[in-house]
Amino acid sequence: MVRFPIFATLLAVSLWSLSAQTTGTASINGFTDSKACATCHRDIAAKYARTGMGRSFYKPAAANTVEDYAKTPEYYHALSDSHYRMTIRNGEYFQRRWQIGLDGKEINVEEVKIDYVIGSGNHGRFYLHRTEQGMLVEVPLAWYPVKGGQWGMAPGSDLPQPKTRQFIAYKCLFCHDAYPKIPAGNEVPGADPVFVGDLPEGIDCQRCHGPGAEHVRTYGKAAMVNPSKLSFDGRMDVCLQCHLEPTGGDIPTKLQRFERGPFSYIPGQPLVDFAIFFDYAPGRRENRFEGVGGAFQFRKSRCYLESGQKLECGNCHDPHDVPRGPAAIRQYSAVCLKCHRTAHPAGVRVSSADCITCHMPKRRADDAPHMIFTDHRIQRRAPANALSEFAESAPEPYHGEVVPYYPAPLPATPENDLYRAVAQVGTGNNVAAGMPELVRLMEEMKPSEAEYYMVLGGGWKNLGNPTEAVAAYEQALRLKPDLARAMRALAEVQPERAESILARAVEVAPNDPESWFQFGMLTASAERIQKAIALNPWFRDQYRGLAEVTHSEEALKAALRSDPFDDAAWDLGGRILTEKGKFREAFFDFQRAIAIRPSGSHLFDYALGLIRADRFDDAQIQAEAAVREDVNLAEAHELLGGLHARKGELTQAAGEYMAAIALKPDLARVHLRLGMVLATQGKTDEAAAHLREAARGNDAAVAEQANQALRQLAPR
């Protein structure tokens, strides 16, 4: 099955032509270059530039380099059997990745330029490459300050299948940088995260103080947002716009309203007007400690809950000036002692020096084990083994209700009720339970945003109801006739019209690589797939798709360069090379696929390749492994039946053929082979029954052989 890239319509023209038609926050919402702030606020700007927020995003340069490129340039990642090298050439920074293939040769070599660094280095530094299309891709290797500074895999990549095409979404830059420019039209849901022109470097003043263009133009006479003068909720919203993430897991933890652009939130506005935050159901994953969970943990603390809105982020944190070391401990502990000096039980000695080490300890993040953060839960006793090292694990899918978390309570409005239903369905967490409410509310409200109908269509598809999915996607297209993403979705659930639908998609969105790719795969057209690659060569599935259609070794090599951890690409390589008689290389590829994911289908394909090389005993070993891995793989049972029959092991052969038929009763060729085996065993009646089934099948050649065998079985 072909998997299509997750991103929506790409405005895949060159970066420079996009600059003439951009949407920037400056032109829409009155933002300006924050360097102007330092003219009047020199001291504050200088202190802020040293904070983590001020150093959150930047181009790599000698002045901000903390890594030791000369001493430790290489890193080997054993889990994925891949090598990395970080290098500097002529003042430019690069990350190179490779593996070792047959005869010790380097394979799957990819080197990309590091255009930006995301992360101040307080917790980590992560490297971004900017594509010609203006997208940002996070490369797999990162740097962490632990143990004096060391290389390590980025979160989500310290696994057997690191992420080689981790695109940076708009929501990532929303919090890790100042306001960037994006192409006109990309404010809509599902738009690809394309950026235009030079990106700002670091979170700027306007993230908390709002648009500053008019303030600068009038030399300070026009007011800006002063968070300290907002209400308690308003002040918290300013912080929580970025620091609140109930979980990094696979739920809609921050559901942005569909009519809002990705950078449209203005400090001072109610955050709920921009997004609603969701959490797991009560009692599910309660004790997690995640990297971006500081505000989430803080809001669970007794100190916060019982303070009567007297405790907030600003009690401890001055965003303009972050203390370090002993000064930080003294400052934060002083805040604690405003309440707790007299509140401690009698006989408990309270030191003004340090409340933090015990009650807000450093902990490793569950979702980013290389990173260490402060625990804001403010617990009486520090959790055990808070800094113990552990291996990263792939997140487990969550199935169940997702519940509104912030604001609490969520205001009871029809629109908010609709978003609550969207949250159940949109990422597939609670589809069966959520769909009735989503359907009811949409019938009542008849929303005018196409995205609601995209969610509805996805829900019906998830439930196996293509008819209703078609109706939903068609309504999305009535509301937004040029929505190529809806056309692609419609083509998947209406295969009889898929070709004409996708032809329309590439007509209305000729620069959308995903439509060209889906169209090319449907029609087995190398030309259309190559068109998709030309529009955006960074979508990995396109190269594998081209190799599937053309059986080209060059396309296969490109697929594995783009993602050498794609087991499907390795398996495809094994099949292509087997066809060409290159068995040694083919078996290497099969073994790689199985090492990454030992699925029954990969083991079965390896067994077929071994048969082509006349290695029947080895083929039987792999076929048996395939059945152990996937007992429902009928083709593996069929193959085992043939291998047993070849050795004259008729009882075992019959058993495997029967297992295959039990799984797929209409396999005419298996009925034929089973009939032959049974006839050889002298079980004439049973043989005849299976031969008649084979004769009734749609395969003319099989039917002819079955009829011939039946004639031979007939009494003379």
Stretch-by-stretch model annotation:
Residues E444-M445, L479, V508, L535, ...:
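Structural marker of alpha-solenoid helical repeat scaffolds
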Residues E449-E451, A484-R485, P513-E514, R540-D541, ...:
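Helix-start (N-cap) detector for alpha-helical repeat units in TPR-like alpha-solenoids
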Residues G24, I28, K35, D43-G119, ...:
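Primarily the internal scaffold of c-type cytochrome electron-transfer domains
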Residues K461, P495, A524, H551, ...:
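Position-specific recognition of the canonical hydrophobic site in helix A of tetratricopeptide repeat
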